[in-house]
Amino acid sequence: MEKLTDLNYTLSVITLMNDTLHTIMEDPGMAYFPYIASVLTVLFTLHKASIPTMKIALRTSRCSYKVIKYCIVSIFNTLLKLAGYKEQITTKDEIEKQMDRVVKEMRRQLEMIDKLTTREIEQVELLKRIHDMLIIKPVDKIDMSQEFNQRQFKTLNEWAEGENPYEPKEVTASL
């Protein structure tokens, strides 16, 4: 177990692996060899570094499950970034946080819609009352007999007060 955390041992294994790959593939025209070697080196280093890191994390922390989960997610996200992917793995806690945020936003929007609907209903009721007040009465219900020009039909004696209301009056003002 001590060899797993020994840096010299890890570096010697990486050097041995690189030397082995160089001897196997001695073709100078091999264009992808540096990329393959670097990927294998990164994978080996991650493998060798992750085990001691998790052991140290488990010893020092009380919440072992969350630490292991975080380490694994971080390792996979690093591998995805090395592979060129922009997506990331998210933990269940992050998904629950995002779901809570979405649900909270939906509740806020529903409350706003409810307020707007209530205001619209109040406005419709107000418009209905205004319309009821402005409705024009039908002609057959209005007594139009007093609206005709009665000056031609009645004489001075027939007027109620003895004067024709349509005649202009003389107005005198005191000076």
Swiss-Prot record:
Transmembrane segment boundaries: 29-51
Binding site for Ca(2+): 120, 123
Gene3D superfamilies according to UniProt: 1.20.5.430
Keyword Ion transport appears in the UniProt entry: yes
Entry keywords, A to Z: Activation of host autophagy by virus, Calcium, Enterotoxin, Glycoprotein, Host endoplasmic reticulum, Host membrane, Host-virus interaction, Ion channel, Ion transport, Membrane, Metal-binding, Secreted, Signal-anchor, Toxin, Transmembrane, Transmembrane helix, Transport, Viral ion channel, Virulence
Record-level GO BP terms: monoatomic ion transmembrane transport; symbiont-mediated activation of host autophagy; viral process
Cellular location(s): Host rough endoplasmic reticulum membrane; Host membrane, Host caveola; Secreted
Ranges in the topological domain labelled Lumenal: 1-28
Glycosylation sites: 8, 18
Keyword Secreted assigned: yes
GO terms under cellular component: extracellular region; host caveola; host cell rough endoplasmic reticulum membrane; membrane
Major location category of this protein: host cell
Modifications made to the protein after synthesis: The N-glycosyl content is primarily Man(9)GlcNAc, with a small amount of Man(8)GlcNAc.
Cytoplasmic side: 52-175
Domain notes: Binds 1 calcium ion per tetramer.
Subunit and partners: Homotetramer. Interacts with the immature particle in the viroplasm. Interacts with host CAV1, early and late in infection. Interacts with host integrin ITGA1/ITGB1 heterodimer. Interacts with host integrin ITGA2/ITGB1 heterodimer. Interaction with microtubules blocks trafficking to the Golgi apparatus.
Family recorded in the similarity comment: Belongs to the rotavirus NSP4 family.
Function: Plays an essential role in the virus replication cycle by acting as a viroporin. Creates a pore in the host endoplasmic reticulum and as a consequence releases Ca(2+) in the cytoplasm of infected cell. In turn, high levels of cytoplasmic calcium trigger membrane trafficking and transport of viral ER-associated proteins to viroplasms, sites of viral genome replication and immature particle assembly.
UniProt protein name: Non-structural glycoprotein 4
Species in which this protein is naturally found: Rotavirus A (strain RVA/Human/Japan/AU-1/1982/G3P3[9]) (RV-A)
Phylogenetic classification of the source organism: Viruses, Riboviria, Orthornavirae, Duplornaviricota, Resentoviricetes
